Amino acid sequence: MAHGPGALMLKCVVVGDGAVGKTCLLMSYANDAFPEEYVPTVFDHYAVSVTVGGKQYLLGLYDTAGQEDYDRLRPLSYPMTDVFLICFSVVNPASFQNVKEEWVPELKEYAPNVPFLLIGTQIDLRDDPKTLARLNDMKEKPVCVEQGQKLAKEIGACCYVECSALTQKGLKTVFDEAIIAILTPKKHTVKKRIGSRCINCCLIT
């Protein structure tokens, strides 16, 4: 964390498989508008002024590319990070699996002491008929809240938050929780947030 002339500067880096909604997550939050087209990200940066607990912060949001082609380039954005958001799409079970197989190991290698949150994206598609039909054809189904909560506990995430960049449901909570994770390090509980509900679950250590 670096101190500016006014607000406290915080750095938040978003990681996860390609096309799970990382860029949409950031753009919808930073610009209050959902992007119309998908453009694979190499690296991008946004800055948003936010107030949490009556205090103002300048949150630097760093987007990263999830594709394997950028495996060597991506960690260049990791130094001085205050918190990571590991994203997966709730309608892409493979991206959920890769959280544990790829993204957690990568963060443990390059930023072992930095807190991270587990973020389930694209929840607006959970009940979408076309999406459900596509998943059914592959003998798959959307990732449920309980699965996300369980994985968050397994990997040691600060909390599990679900959101939709399209409808903005849960979107503000994602970044409020990210700031809280920075300001209260070494949390020993995982929280599940759905709307206004919050359930605490103790981690087994």
Swiss-Prot record:
Protein's cellular compartments: Cytoplasm; Cell membrane
Covalently lipidated residues, kind S-farnesyl cysteine: C202
Annotated keywords: Cell membrane, Cytoplasm, GTP-binding, Lipoprotein, Membrane, Methylation, Nucleotide-binding, Prenylation
Annotated CDD domains: Tc10
Modification(s) after translation: May be post-translationally modified by both palmitoylation and polyisoprenylation.
Function: Plasma membrane-associated small GTPase which cycles between an active GTP-bound and an inactive GDP-bound state. In active state binds to a variety of effector proteins to regulate cellular responses. Involved in epithelial cell polarization processes. May play a role in CFTR trafficking to the plasma membrane. Causes the formation of thin, actin-rich surface projections called filopodia.
Name under which the protein is recorded: Rho-related GTP-binding protein RhoQ
UniProt lineage: Eukaryota, Metazoa, Chordata, Craniata, Vertebrata
